[in-house]
Amino acid sequence: MDVSRVTACSFPLKEKDLDYTFQVISASGFEKIDLVGRMPHFSVTDPEYDLDELRRVIDKYGVALANIGSYCGRGFSDGSKSGRQAALDEMKQTLDVAKEFGAKSIRIFPGDGTRASMGEVVPYFKESAEYAEKVGVYMGIENHGGEISGNPEACKEISEKVGSRYFGILYEPCNLMAAGAEYKSAFETFKDHIVHVHVKDGRANAEGKWERCMLGDGEIDYQWVWQQVEASGYDRDYALEFEVGNIEPVETGYKKWLNTWANM
């Protein structure tokens, strides 16, 4: 499959500095990065974070910023108005940096993740989406295991309530399966709201528990994912997310994943 639209998530290198992280991802054959939104990789709130260092490693290794895997939106459930405003400011600042560096999207979180809080967080996401449209950067809730992010119907509901094409879902088939949601039916539920895609693989073990594995060794049919997502009109990136350091070091594993994707 097309490798020109593949990126590498920096999450498996989250404890490493930016220079080492970009070195590994570049050496693995990637030209774009999905940068996790925590120190030392990224922050708009930590005064020690240096955007000039990010510029330096991008230029040094020729790896472009494709997506920021931020944690923006969590503060929309804060108990104080000032806390929610601070979260909104963080969201807008992150969108500004994404635009400045040419990233197409950012990952976001649906407040505290509970369905009961949806009505409280939607107004903040509406304002965020208006700003996102102005700067041309998409925002996506990543499928995790929460009441919203791990529930396809809730993902669709919050997307419809916000009502912006710049707000939607970061489709993550493997995370959905881990949460007990079948990834193909989930796609059908929220396919009109997909703004980004994460790629990793997994399978049920002998006890029926979902476990991650090397890309191509699991149950996720990524040819199906590619065909369906492309048919929906999606034209952005697919981020490989290597989270199997217990099987192989990321330093050698990412190159294998890129080759696996290319040969699918």
Residue ranges and their predicted role:
Residues D34, N67-G69, R107, G140, ...:
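Conserved beta-strand positions in the central sheet of alpha/beta enzyme cores
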Residues P12-K14, G37-M39, Y71-R74, R107-T114, ...:
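Active-site-proximal loop/turn and secondary-structure-junction residues that shape catalytic pockets
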Residues M1-T7, A66-D78, R107:
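N-terminal small/glycine-rich loop or linker at the start of catalytic domains
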Residues V44-L51, S80, R84, L88, ...:
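Flexible, glycine- and charge-enriched loops at secondary-structure boundaries
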Residues D17-Y20, V57-A64, F76-I169, A178, ...:
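Active-site acidic/histidine proton-transfer and metal-coordination neighborhood
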Residues M39-S43, R74-G79, D112-A116, A178-G180, ...:
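A short acidic, helix-capping loop that chelates divalent metal ions and anchors anionic groups
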Residues M1-T7, K14-E31, R55, D59, ...:
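Histidine-acidic metal/acid-base catalytic patches
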Residues D34-D59, P110-A116:
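Glycine-rich, proline-tolerant flexible connector loops at the mouths of alpha/beta enzymes
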